[in-house]
Amino acid sequence: MGIKSLDDLLSEGVTGRGVLVRSDLNVPVDDDGNISDPGRIIASVPTLKALSDAGAKVVVTAHLGRPKGEPDPKFSLAPVAKALGEKLGRHVQLAGDVVGTDALARAEGLTDGDILLLENIRFDPRETSKDDAERLKLAKALVELVGGEDGSSAAFVSDGFGVVHRKQASVYDVATLLPHYAGTLVDTEIKVLAQLTEAGERPYAVVLGGSKVSDKLAVIENLATKADSLVIGGGMCFTFLAAQGLSVGSSLLEESMVETCRKLLDDYGDVLHLPVDIVVAEKFAADSPAETVAADRIPDDKMGLDIGPESVKRFTALLSNAKTIFWNGPMGVFEFPAFAAGTKGVAEAIIGATGKGAFSVVGGGDSAAAVRQLGLPEDGFSHISTGGGASLEYLEGKELPGIQVLE
């Protein structure tokens, strides 16, 4: 696909040009403004640094959390601006609004190499509006900040891979108004995901966890036809176990999906692999005493919170021979130490396979958080994606609006 890259833009020369960048800076921030996982901020640095070094006047737009379309101090990008400045090693200005008087004044005062971060784009209800005309109005206001009126030299760089599956003003509509380019991050992500959907090296193993089958159904259906083995763990494995006629106690169960899982097992039984043992507890709590039971022996009064050691052993054997691996979703409640061994064991198996030459991708979201929280080496994997939802939708075979518009 003919998407222009950041290198294409830099080779045209950007000194003195206004460049609007959509970054993904949606990181976890606590009430005191502390960022527990700066992964997405770090991932946004290469594009911003390259543009700033080349003398562009950089205006960055991003969101944090899910504010209700109006300013909310809880979702201010102030702590993000500070952290971004530290990672970049240069000052990042924060506008007090999205496209208001402060943003305009600051944008007009930018000199070559300066970086201005606009306040949370989702403070403006037009960003996520379903009304095309409303979104376009906001997009035009954003374009104005980089002097992008007719005949100007302004440009748009899409670098927020975590939002490319959303048809939003700062992701989609601005790209219809300005010459557009994929930033380093988006460029890398597209190439990596293409390797997972096109003929990669075999055997191809997929590991899916997380709580709900309904969230992953389309990706299971799409990848079950492409993968040699598809490992199911996390909360969603109980709906599959129930589909086999097993009792799952008080474990998470999507009743409405049992029949769907039964059909998937009928159609792809040779590809799908379920846990054979489960770590159970009486309640969903870090201090709830844990015990391991066979998958067909879950007591009525207990819930499964992790896969057991025998499952880890079997999944490790599958993964050790794989040449291409995609992992999305934890195997258990890794936030509680007593229920983290399944996720850690499977992650270590993927790292082991990668060390032997496999191409491995961690599909964003909770899996990436688990890697960091469990103290696993991030460079043990070929690639850790920054976009959970976006990478899943890509692997489902869906068109991503934010990518489509760049083509």
From Swiss-Prot:
It catalyses: (2R)-3-phosphoglycerate + ATP = (2R)-3-phospho-glyceroyl phosphate + ADP. Keywords: ATP-binding, Cytoplasm, Glycolysis, Kinase, Nucleotide-binding, Transferase. One of its GO terms (molecular function) is ADP binding. Pathway: Carbohydrate degradation; glycolysis; pyruvate from D-glyceraldehyde 3-phosphate: step 2/5. It comes from the Bacteria. The keyword Oxidoreductase does not apply. It is an enzyme of class 2 (transferase). One of its GO terms (biological process) is gluconeogenesis. Substrate binds at D24, L25, N26, R40, H63, L64, G65, R66, R122, R166. GO terms for cellular component: cytosol. ATP binds at K216, G304, E335, G364, G365, D366, S367. Its EC number is 2.7.2.3. It is found in: Cytoplasm. Belongs to the phosphoglycerate kinase family. HAMAP family: Phosphoglyc_kinase. Monomer. This is Phosphoglycerate kinase. It comes from Mycolicibacterium vanbaalenii (strain DSM 7251 / JCM 13017 / BCRC 16820 / KCTC 9966 / NRRL B-24157 / PYR-1) (Mycobacterium vanbaalenii).
